[in-house]
Structure formats: C-alpha cells, structure tokens
Amino acid sequence: MLIDPNNGSPDYFVIFNYDLPIKHIISKNITLHPYHVKNPIAMTLLRDVMIAEVNFTDDEIPDEYRTGFFHTSQYFSRDQLEIFLACLQISNQPSNEKKNVFNFLEDSNNKPYEILGLYDAFPVGILSNSQPIFPFEDSTIDTVVNSSFYQFGTPFLYPISPTHISNSIEFYKKVQSILNKKNTKNEKETSWLLQNILLTYYKSKIDYTLVSISNSMEIIESMFGAPANITMSIRERVPKYLGYGSEKLSKILRTMYAIRSVNDHLKYTHQFSSNPWLHNFYDNKRFISSLTTILIEKWVDEIFNGKTRKEFRTSIIDDEKYSKK
C-alpha cells in the first residue's frame, strides 16, 4: 500500500531517471516536490531525480505507471526521505565534505548538515514559490547521514533505497563502537587503523579517477599488508576472502595495480576502455566502489566481532607461500 491504511498519509517516492516521457503520465494522484539546495548549479548533478508524493493505493496503480514510472523508483517514509535529502545535500556541497568527514570521525555527536527543504506541490515544468513542507533552516540531522555517504559516494553510482539507509545505520553503529573502544593498546591501534581506512575509503568515493584507484588499493593493502611484498598475494587473498571466483577478481586486481602505476590520464582511460572483459563486467567507477564497500564492511564486521588486525590478516592465508610473505 502506498497510503498508510491507519492514517491515510502518503509515502514519499524518489523517482530516478526522471525524463520527459514521465511528465506525460503525471496525474492528480501524484504530486511532485522540488528540493532546495544552496548551490543551484549543483542541481544539474541530480537533474534526473525527483521527489513525489503518491496518493493512491497499490491496487489502484494504472498499468502505465507500473511499466514506467514506478520501475526506476523507490518508496521512502518521511524519516528515510530526510536522510536521503541530506545525502543529496552532502553531494551538492563538495567544499565541505572533507572537513565534515573528519569531524564525524572525531566527534560521534557532531551534526554538521542542515535538513534540505522540500517544497510543496508545483505544476510540472513550472517552479513554485509555495511554502516548504520541510523547512530549509539551520536545524541539523543525525550523523548517520555521514555513514550513509561513506557507502554511496558522490555522484551516486546507485540509487539510494530505504534498505541502504537501514544498512548504513548499522554500519555507523559498528564503526562508532570500534572507535570508542580504547581500553587497551591494541584496541586503540585498531581504532586509529579503522579511522585511517575510512578516510581513505571516503577519498576513493568522491574521486573516481586514477586517484580513486590509488586510494582503493591503499585500503586493500592496509588490510592485508605492506604493498612492497604482497602485491601478488593480494590478488589471490582478496578473491578468496570475498568468496568470489579467484580468477576473475585476480584479473581485475592486476588491472587496478597496473592502472595505478600509470601517470598519464589518457593512457589510464585507454587501458580501461581497451579491456573488453573489464568493460563488460563493471565499469571502473562501479567496480571500485563495489569492491571497496564490500571489503570495508566485512573488515568492520571482523573487528566489531573482536578479531584483531593480525588475526584478520592471517586467518585467510591458507597457502604456505603467502604466509611467508
């Protein structure tokens, strides 16, 4: 049901890939809401995203909506929508990103982001001067948005869903739990290691060029050892750890190492575009984002469950030649 049967209030609906054909099937049952950002130019980064309020029940959805309008969209509750809008805000304020991500790691109570304004109904294609239903003001939101942004990056490689937000909250809680454990020397070292890895991961999220590949490889190496002597080992150990096909992931990791050594951006672009297997499996941005996300989340789980860095690194080495490296 798109309408809560208890109070009749609508869910909000985030529409991705909003385009001209969609405008022709908007009806009185769907209300579009523009969201407000400080930098109008940045809106072009998200020009294919629109917020809608859906005012009919699931069994009333016409076929033309099911095949087009709803196919590339996600349902959000009011609370989830606020987090989503805050993620949009972070992606539209790149000048503040690095400063605020440091604040987030240093102070679990830091709340640096304002709630985005979501405006009332407006005719399709016409801007409105109506009053906002979410005020754009100096109030702030919880730092869970920061942890969400760690997972999504900017610009978004994938549409954010309510499930992503829920997972980010759990991820945030685990990270904070690890960072707050400082009773022993090992726990303190683990806390700092986690902080450094998250910052490197963050940098790889906001820059998906050659710099991103370098940052992503730094993350992998910090988890598995020093780069000088484990390059070949990583190619086997990472696929084994992730449970994927060793041959495919090893091939990708070899390519990533090769690309990182290339200083010429044009040559870097050519290497990726001229590799048909890589092009068909993942484009470079999506693969780097996916691989580092999976690795970071698994690593956080291991440490959260009490495993030390040394135990983490040695537990997945079941080949004698790698254990000697």
Walk through the language-model features, giving the residues of each.
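Short, solvent-exposed segments of well-ordered alpha helices
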Residues: K188, K203-L210, E247-R254, H279-D283
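Flexible secondary-structure boundary motifs
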Residues: S212-S250
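Charged, amphipathic alpha-helical oligomerization/scaffolding segments
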Residues: K203, T255-V262, F287, L291
